[in-house]
Amino acid sequence: VRAFGQVFSSRGMHAPGVKGAVSIQPAVSVCPVKVISTGITCCLPNNGKISMGFKSSVEHGLYILRGSIIPGVAAKNGLTCADCELLREALLHFPDNDCSSSRPAGSIEVRRLYWWEHPGKLGVCPPAIVFSSVIAEPLRSRPASFADYEITNAEIPGVKLSIFENDT
């Protein structure tokens, strides 16, 4: 609740929600991806029911996920620096133990995390400037690995940048 907030719903009661200090946007691919759909069938008898489904996967993709922490809301909710460090570790390692048939172990990895810290609660610049300071450019027309991209970041005066690598 301290990080992501909470909407309280109770029948017949009005309870105010808790605004989340942490905002995580959906990840977006740098280049178009090729989606592969695979049919799955069940070999066991199923009382005449259809037992076929599909799973979808992506052949290769480099995705950028953006997020931010609102300092004023964080202070109000009691979000601490230690909580932020746990969030950073969670972002670096979230796919490590989350495998499935469409996401086999090791098929998704976080390669790099850019973590900015502004001095003070108001910050030096809006999040859009921070987000646009990192640019991922494909080096080939059809990238097939992380090495097929050039990733650069522009310095933002007054904002501390830490880069965390997951070299696998």
Label each region the model flagged:
Residues 1-168:
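RNA-binding basic/glycine-rich loop and surface signature characteristic of RAMP-family CRISPR effectors
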